[in-house]
Structures are given as C-alpha cells and as structure tokens.
C-alpha cells in the first residue's frame, strides 16, 4: 500500500502504523519498510497492544503501547491519545514490540488448534512456552527479550488466545475442524516470516514451527503436539 501511494511527497509528517505483522519472505518489520518508503523528514510510530474494536465501542477500557525511534514524537502521541478508554504506555523497544505483536497472532492460531482438538487446557502452557520462544527471537534480533512479556505480546494473549473476536484463534479452530473461514488471519502469513527469521538468527521456535508444519506441510496436529511434548527435558528458563 505504501509503495502504491505517493509517500515521497509527504514531508515532516508522523505516520502511525496501527497494524501487526512482518513481511513475508524477509521477516522485515513494518516500521522499517515504511521508513524506507517515506522521505527522511517523516517519523514512523507504531500503535500496538490488546483490544478489540467491538469492546472499545461498548466502552470497555484497555491498555496499549505507542513506540517510535523518535522519543519526542512518541511522548506527544501518548499524551494526546491517552483517555479513560485507552491507557497508553511509552514503548522502548521497536524490535521487541513489533516482533512480539506480530508473533502473538501465530500463538492465536495455535490456541485455535488446541480448541479444535479439544485440548484447551494446554493454553496455559502455550502462553508460557510461546512467550519464551518469542523472547529468544527478540533477543537474537537485538531487542529486549522482556518485551515479549509486555502488552504487545503476552499482554495481547487474552484478546487473541481466548477472545471470541480473535480471527486468528477462530481460523485455527476452523482449520482443524476442516471448516471454511473467510476472514483475515494475519498469523497465517506471519508464521512464514517467522520461519525466515528462525533460519536467519538460528533460534529455536518449536511452537511456531509446529503451526507452520500444520498450515503449510499438512502435518497432523496431534502428531505435532506429541512431538512438542516429547522434546528433550530441560529447565523451564533455559535458553
């Protein structure tokens, strides 16, 4: 979309990306792509975190994050957008916040898989171990691994892993049950990008790999789950 618009005509503007994802084929972050297409006088910021439009419309509040490489712009956006409906926090890690926000959609699909095979009780383990592997990736990419435990990833799980509004969770469950699903599930494309990053940075992403195998390699979901449970024993917080 940015490539099609006359973005170079913009000068001295702030572009806020209210989306979560990574570029297929490269794993590149959206802010980096936007920055490469915009004139250097512009500033890119990201608006990330949990929340569904349906709930905001009903007056249900939530917390979110705004991040940018420009601290002054970031502070201005947080101060101007904060309200009784959304409490914003200042982000401090573009890599971790963007990668974490994108990866949570893949975890959402995995949650749908668990619902589809009637093993929803494993969602606690999925949340814990999924966060751990995303933290490893963020660290390898030069970000702060603690970002995986913040609002942009772990903090967004309720809206993705459990919510009836989650397109990714619904897609995962429908996929397992061989039912048609016609809404956008961003995690379907994001998992491809994560496989690129996994290879590039040499990081283990067993849950993301299992999701990829089921979606793209027609792997058996129960067999993939069994393989995850049979992985070598280790301490919970080993790298």
How should each PLM-predicted stretch be described?
Residues 1, 33, 37-43, 61-147:
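Internal alpha-helical scaffold of NAD(P)-dependent oxidoreductase catalytic cores
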Residues 1-59, 77:
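Rossmann-like NAD(P)(H) cofactor-binding subdomain of soluble oxidoreductases
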